[in-house]
């Protein structure tokens, strides 16, 4: 059976949830083979988790240069593996980096590319949710080694103990024109779950009205142990930082529960959250498009509904 390569997502020595989801998806296409790219020592704390997730093989590509260049080292490693092992497909997370890596890799190896799929089927067929979830379509990429980016949270991880055979591979020296990282600035952080990894997301839109009013959104999120998101309208209005934007030009999420407060539901926003398992919308406009995809909707003032919901959850939790 041919291998299906999976680019491992990790941070601070821990696997991201989407890595297990990708390994599960890869199982449909071939024997899951995880690819870890990073500085020396990166793979050590990840091996057990990758075995548990079902990785039959773990390619370890470690180099001091791995975190000194944007994207290039990862593309180089995957391209080399695609040439040497002739995998059935290469799977990546549909993050900003994942999409760029996928695009560059497909161009490099002359293969087709499927972006932001919500499921993977035999024959390297990708399932897409399009037009705000109105249509579900299938697509198949051309080429010997299709490159597929998978939406985080769309595939349910199904652990299956794998052999986890470790194979060291070289990180090719970056080209002279490769973009080098010269400085780093810390991102805005909080104690909430990562937006793309969270099982519950509470988002606010233009209807929240101001940056100060976003405390209502945060309070509800904290009562649920949820991540906080924002629509593009809220971000453009300066209500919340851009790194929390959800939608076509922001992040894509697929949590078990998505609560939309004061979000009208433009198709661009829906593109980033429409595959959420359960959607709850609160909006004073009963004609708001968000209600078209909501499982539960409340037509009302979010500043009355959200605090009551927060208080009710806290009371239930004791």
From Swiss-Prot:
What is this protein identified as? Electron transfer flavoprotein subunit alpha
Entry keywords, A to Z: Electron transport, FAD, Flavoprotein, Transport
Q: Which Gene3D superfamilies match?
A: HUPs, TPP-binding domain
User: Taxonomy-wise, where does this protein's organism fall, top ranks first?
Assistant: Bacteria, Bacillati, Actinomycetota, Actinomycetes, Mycobacteriales
Q: Does the keyword Ubl conjugation apply?
A: no
Free-text function comment from the UniProt entry: The electron transfer flavoprotein serves as a specific electron acceptor for other dehydrogenases. It transfers the electrons to the main respiratory chain via ETF-ubiquinone oxidoreductase (ETF dehydrogenase).
Q: Which domain of life is it from?
A: Bacteria
* Entry binding sites for FAD: 257-285
What are the names of the required cofactors? Answer: FAD
Similarity-based family: Belongs to the ETF alpha-subunit/FixB family.
InterPro entries with a match to the protein in the record: DHS-like_NAD/FAD-binding_dom (IPR029035), ETF_a/b_N (IPR014730), ETF_a/FixB (IPR001308), ETF_alpha_N (IPR033947), ETF_asu_C (IPR014731), ETF_asu_C_CS (IPR018206), Rossmann-like_a/b/a_fold (IPR014729)
| Cofactor note (record) | Binds 1 FAD per dimer.
GO biological process: one example:
fatty acid beta-oxidation using acyl-CoA dehydrogenase
State how it assembles: Heterodimer of an alpha and a beta subunit.
The record lists the membrane-crossing segments as none
| Pfam family name, one | ETF
PANTHER family linked to this entry? ELECTRON TRANSFER FLAVOPROTEIN ALPHA, ELECTRON TRANSFER FLAVOPROTEIN SUBUNIT ALPHA, MITOCHONDRIAL
């Amino acid at each position: 059976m041919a291998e299906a390569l999976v680019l491992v997502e990790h941070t601070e020595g821990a696997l991201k949830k989407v890595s297990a989801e990708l390994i599960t998806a890869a199982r449909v296409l071939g024997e899951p083979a995880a690819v870890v790219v990073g500085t020396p020592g990166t793979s050590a704390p990840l091996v057990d988790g990758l075995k548990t997730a079902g990785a039959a093989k773990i390619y370890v590509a470690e180099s001091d240069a791995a975190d000194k260049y944007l994207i290039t080292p990862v593309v180089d490693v995957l391209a080399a593996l695609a040439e040497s092992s002739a995998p059935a497909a290469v799977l990546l997370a549909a993050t900003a980096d994942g999409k760029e890596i996928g695009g560059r890799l497909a161009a490099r190896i002359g293969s087709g590319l499927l972006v932001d799929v919500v499921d993977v089927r035999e024959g390297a067929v990708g399932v897409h949710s399009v037009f705000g979830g109105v249509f579900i379509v299938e697509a198949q990429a051309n080429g010997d080694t299709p490159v597929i980016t998978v939406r985080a949270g769309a595939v349910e991880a199904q652990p299956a103990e794998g052999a986890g055979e470790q194979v060291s591979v070289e990180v090719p020296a970056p080209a002279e024109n490769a973009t080098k990282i010269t400085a780093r600035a810390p991102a805005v952080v909080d104690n909430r779950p990562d937006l793309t990894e969270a099982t519950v997301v509470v988002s606010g839109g233009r209807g929240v009205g101001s940056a100060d009013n976003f405390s209502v959104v945060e309070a509800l999120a904290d009562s649920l142990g949820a991540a906080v998101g924002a629509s593009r309208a809220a971000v453009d209005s300066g209500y919340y930082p851009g790194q929390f934007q959800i939608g076509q030009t922001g992040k894509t999420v697929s949590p078990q529960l998505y609560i939309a407060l004061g979000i009208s539901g433009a198709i661009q926003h829906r593109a980033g959250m429409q595959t959420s398992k359960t959607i709850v919308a609160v909006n004073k406009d009963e004609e708001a498009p968000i209600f078209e995809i909501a499982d539960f909707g409340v037509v009302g003032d979010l500043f009355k509904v959200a605090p009551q919901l927060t208080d009710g959850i806290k009371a239930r939790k004791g």
